[in-house]
């Protein structure tokens, strides 16, 4: 005996009221065993219920003699968080002959009334606790007795099935005898109808043959057209293949050409980068020279401006002196003129006096 931890698995069924057939859940693992759940909604006039079964997954892949015991309980819930648990009072046995549990019965009316079909969705949580797992070669004496009793029960069920099958076969034989007698009577009546219908059938067969011949001719012509179209399509496909090959060759040639051009461009770019670096260096040198020349020119200009200022000052002073001399000369000339005029006036007066004396 070994107890495993309880495992829960939840799955949702959408549009539950519209489901009419068996619903399988995904496979899940509990107690190192693979399981799945079957939900079977049965709806008829006499009985309406939902059966939920726990199944062992892929029992045919297990070795003979396997056996498992597990507790199986259900929890129903809705989207609003309401829950109800359907516990398990017994421990179910799973083996080769019984790979599923006893069903849990759920009435759909109660599911609707208690609000477990909210938005027509049924949410089922399966709780499985594996109590015992027996592999082949691990059976004890007590377990062998239980297994043999279970196998005898299974064999008895199989024998009862064979008895039921034999009874069904006897009933079928009796039904066949009655059917044969009825068939003989019906066959006499049908023979007359068959004789009358035979001529009609022959005529219909002839018309059908004519139609078939016409259809065959039509089909042959269509087949020839289709074959011609297929030949054209094959020719077009071959042309397309040749064009694709040529295109690939051209693309390869273009790639080679582009690669060579790219190499040339890269070389040119490298040269251009080298030239640009040289130009930058030259520009820097020219800037330095220009700055040096500007400084030299500024110093020379300052010297020239100082010399010119000195010469201008000397020139101005000389001009000022000349202007003063010129003014003095003008004053002297004016004084000289005044004295000359005075002398002229005086000489005139003296002349008049002489004239008066001589007169």
Curated annotation (Swiss-Prot):
Residues 146-337 form a coiled coil. Keywords: Coiled coil. InterPro entries: MATH-CC_domain_protein, MATH/TRAF_dom, TRAF-like. This is MATH domain and coiled-coil domain-containing protein At2g42475. It comes from Arabidopsis thaliana (Mouse-ear cress). The keyword Coiled coil applies. The keyword Oxidoreductase does not apply. Residues 6-128 form the MATH domain. Transmembrane segments: none annotated.
């Amino acid at each position: 005996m070994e107890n495993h931890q309880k495992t829960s698995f939840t799955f949702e069924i959408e549009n539950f009221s519209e489901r009419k057939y068996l619903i399988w859940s995904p496979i899940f693992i509990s107690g190192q065993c693979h399981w799945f759940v079957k939900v079977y909604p049965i709806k008829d006039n006499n009985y309406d219920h939902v059966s939920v079964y726990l199944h062992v997954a892929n029992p045919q892949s297990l070795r003979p003699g396997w056996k498992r015991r597990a507790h199986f309980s259900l929890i129903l819930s809705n989207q609003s968080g309401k829950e109800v648990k359907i516990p398990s009072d017994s421990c179910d046995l799973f083996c080769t002959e019984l790979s599923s549990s006893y069903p849990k019965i759920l009435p759909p009316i109660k599911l609707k009334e208690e609000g477990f079909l909210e938005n027509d969705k049924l949410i089922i949580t399966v709780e499985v606790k594996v109590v015992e797992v027996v592999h082949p070669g691990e059976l004890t004496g007590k377990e062998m007795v239980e297994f043999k009793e279970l196998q005898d029960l299974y064999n008895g069920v199989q024998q009862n099935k064979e008895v039921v099958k034999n009874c069904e076969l006897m009933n079928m034989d009796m039904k066949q005898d009655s059917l044969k007698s009825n068939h003989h009577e019906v066959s006499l009546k049908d023979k007359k109808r068959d004789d009358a219908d035979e001529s009609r059938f022959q005529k219909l067969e002839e018309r059908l043959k004519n139609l078939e011949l016409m259809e065959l001719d039509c089909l042959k012509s269509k087949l020839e057209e289709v074959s011609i179209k297929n030949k054209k399509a094959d020719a077009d496909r071959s042309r397309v293949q040749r064009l694709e090959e040529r295109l690939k060759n051209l693309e390869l040639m273009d790639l080679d050409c582009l690669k060579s051009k790219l190499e040339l461009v890269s070389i040119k770019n490298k040269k251009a980068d080298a030239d640009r670096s040289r130009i930058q260096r030259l520009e820097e040198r020219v800037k330095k020279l220009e700055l040096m020349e500007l400084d030299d020119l500024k110093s020379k200009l300052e010297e020239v401006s100082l010399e010119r200022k000195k010469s201008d000052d000397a020139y101005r002073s000389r001009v000022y002196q000349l202007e003063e001399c010129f003014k003095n000369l003008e004053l002297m000339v004016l004084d000289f003129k005044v004295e000359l005029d005075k002398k002229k006036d005086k000489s005139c007066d003296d002349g008049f006096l002489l004239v008066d004396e001589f007169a």
